[in-house]
Amino acid sequence: DCAGMAADIFESYEVTIVSGLILGLALVAIDPTHSLKWIVYPLIIRAIGVISSILGTFTVPIWESFPLKFLRAHDAEEAMFRSYEVSSVNTIFFSFLVAILYAGDWKLAMLTSIGVGLAVVFNPLTSYFTSTRRPPVKEIVKSTRTGPATTILSGLSVGMESSVWALGVIVISFIIALLLYGSQGATYVLYAVAMVGIGMLSHTGNNVAMDSYGPISDNANGIGEMAWHDMEDAE
């Protein structure tokens, strides 16, 4: 349940950094100062993302009993989302420090922030279209009462609608990247898109952990049922 998704996202994780490095090498040749910042900056951001993911993961247990009620998590999903947001804030903060103090170009940090924000938006978007408490899933459940045909059609329509929202958010992020570097040439635009991708996947560790939560909890529940445990133990 976990290996397939982890392998796929790890491939994307590596492809984005490789594309950023290749395009950065091209920009070194184009840049009159031959600055290595185009190559080094993606590596630094990737390192910041890894550290932020680790720090965010350690914050998961605290949200259930967090002092501020409006930030307190009511279930495991909310706790994971909070930890993801902690990682995101940390990455954005340090990306601006690196972009301004090292690279001397705040737009690089903006690209990273757009990518990180894109990943953050995906969490509630995914939850909305897959949670049993939300209208899309309730609509599919309701359609099962009238037969298999309506169930299939309802499921397909909800799936397609969720894809449209995800694609819309991605397109908006690409447009912003184009506006930031569009006047400097095609190579700069491609590099900007690569940096958005690097920012989006900077917390891959959190993503894999969140994906693994489902199979692990499901298997634990199955073991509990076979052991004839009560629902209180399952919770």
Which stretches of residues belong to each language-model region?
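Hydrophobic packing and interface segments
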Residues: 2-235
